[in-house]
């Protein structure tokens, strides 16, 4: 009884929705049936062939289905590598020989040659990351971080020479990487480190000759552009520990904030000031949840890198510089080593790989829902044509529609009263019963045996027309169900 009363109270709510759905369903069935019939006649196929034969299709918008389109989003890292203090380092390779390093407002030039500038008798000898006598405080940690990234170990490797920062000649640090005598293993290790973070550089030193690295402050050249892939390599090279499994730790929980630190509603928005070059695109909390569940997407790595940079700037501005060492210890929780290694192997094998810049996704134009962006692969320094991975974005659209239908089905199940389900069940039983009666069949009219049906005239027992139009034929009649 209580269930029936609850059902009666909910009638105004679900009847309004059910009635509208019923009316729309009837209309759609009629329209779809008519279109299907028209489609089966072949007229549409002929018109489409005559219009499109010999013409090229536009690539501006790819329509996968009726309401799904293939779209893309481009990420700009100009805000990530901005001119602020204590930011992520940015590396540049100019003309394959000039190496540069920049972090915050400090920039450095790295020269590699055989000319000795500093001597142990006249300059400072350092064997620890404390370079306060060589550089200012905002430059010291950057240089020490870079030296560790190329493979130098302070507690095991030879010391370095640097010029006292009070001298008028300028700040300078000198590292001996000559691959000769007892220094050969150390030299090879640092050379490999340079090759790792500066891909494509030319080696100016030869085996057995003197080779020195000189680091000195210098203005950032205008022809150097931000290359976040070098930053990725730098971070992965300078990590202190490697975890076998990659899971997002509590320290790197998502911080959905704007540039001022305010929490915006509706999810993580990649705004013009931060990522998207041409427009605003918001990726809701659903995409964030997918990234937290599955750590196997280049797009998720990019978002984690942005979030890490914001947290690092806030932490370093409020606390001491020693916090950088703690952050670098846990940097491996940000970037998936498996993805980096996989993309590098693809690059070496000349197969498509990801450079973490351009991503594509499938967008549903009616509901605004979209799939999790996936990396747009590169081959031979150019992005793949969208037709080359057509199966991937068609499959992604199928997954998106399946996810939407599953979510809609769950919501409708929650809004459907149990009594309505009972009514639907008994109405189905009633329909099955009437269908059984329809299959048995009942006679609908009477006509002369062996001859055509005289409808709309009715016959009498003599085989004549009751209205008198036809004379009695004295022929047997029979009841028939079909005209």
Curated annotation (Swiss-Prot):
InterPro entries: Arena_glycoprot, Arena_glycoprot_zinc-bd. Residues 2-17, 54-58, 59-422 are extracellular. Zn(2+) 2 binds at residues 445, 447, 453, 483. The record marks 58-59, 249-250 as: Cleavage. Belongs to the arenaviridae GPC protein family. Stable signal peptide (SSP): cleaved and functions as a signal peptide. In addition, it is also retained as the third component of the GP complex. The SSP is required for efficient glycoprotein expression, post-translational maturation cleavage of GP1 and GP2, glycoprotein transport to the cell surface plasma membrane, formation of infectious virus particles, and acid pH-dependent glycoprotein-mediated cell fusion. This is Pre-glycoprotein polyprotein GP complex. It comes from Tacaribe virus (strain V5).
């Amino acid at each position: 009884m209580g269930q029936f009363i609850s059902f009666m109270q909910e009638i105004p709510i679900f009847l309004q929705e059910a009635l509208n759905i019923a009316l729309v369903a009837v209309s759609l069935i009629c329209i779809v049936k008519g279109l299907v019939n028209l489609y089966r006649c072949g007229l549409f196929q002929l018109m489409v062939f005559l219009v499109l034969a010999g013409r090229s299709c536009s690539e501006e918008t790819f329509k996968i289905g009726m309401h799904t389109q293939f779209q893309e989003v481009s990420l700009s890292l100009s805000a990530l590598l901005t001119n602020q203090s204590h930011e992520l380092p940015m590396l540049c390779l100019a003309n394959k020989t000039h190496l540069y390093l920049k972090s915050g407002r400090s920039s450095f030039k790295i020269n590699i040659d055989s000319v000795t500038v500093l001597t142990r008798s006249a300059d400072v000898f350092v064997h620890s990351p404390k370079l306060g006598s060589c550089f200012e405080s905002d430059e010291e940690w950057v240089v020490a971080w870079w030296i560790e990234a190329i493979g130098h170990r302070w507690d095991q490797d030879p010391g370095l020479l640097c010029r006292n920062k009070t001298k008028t000649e300028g700040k300078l640090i000198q590292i001996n990487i000559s691959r000769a005598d007892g220094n050969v293993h150390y030299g090879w290790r640092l050379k490999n480190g340079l090759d790792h973070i500066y891909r494509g550089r030319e080696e100016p030193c030869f085996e057995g000759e003197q080779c020195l690295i000189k680091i000195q402050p210098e203005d950032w050249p205008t022809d150097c552009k931000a290359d976040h892939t070098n930053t990725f390599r730098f971070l992965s090279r300078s990590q202190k520990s490697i975890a076998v499994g990659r899971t997002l730790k509590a320290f790197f929980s998502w911080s959905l904030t704007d540039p001022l630190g305010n929490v915006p509603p509706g999810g993580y928005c990649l705004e013009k000031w931060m990522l998207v070059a041409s427009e605003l695109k918001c990726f809701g909390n659903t995409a964030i949840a997918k990234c937290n569940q599955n750590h196997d997407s280049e797009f998720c790595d990019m978002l984690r890198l942005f979030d890490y940079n914001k947290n690092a700037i806030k932490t370093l501005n409020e606390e001491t510089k020693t916090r950088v060492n703690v952050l670098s210890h846990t940097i491996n929780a940000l970037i998936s080593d498996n993805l980096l290694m996989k993309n590098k192997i693809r690059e070496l094998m000349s197969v498509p790989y990801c450079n973490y810049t351009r991503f594509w996704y499938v967008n549903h134009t009616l509901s605004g829902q979209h799939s999790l962006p996936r990396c747009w692969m590169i081959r031979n320094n150019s992005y793949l044509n969208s037709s080359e991975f057509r199966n991937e974005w068609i499959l992604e659209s199928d997954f998106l529609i399946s996810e939407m239908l599953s979510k809609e089905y769950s919501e409708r199940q929650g809004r459907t009263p149990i009594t309505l389900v009972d009514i639907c069940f008994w109405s189905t039983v009633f329909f099955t019963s009437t269908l059984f009666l329809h299959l048995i069949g009942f006679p609908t009219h009477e006509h002369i045996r062996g001859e055509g049906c005289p409808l709309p005239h009715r016959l009498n027992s003599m085989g004549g027309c009751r209205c008198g139009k036809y004379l009695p034929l004295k022929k047997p009649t029979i009841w028939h169900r079909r005209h």
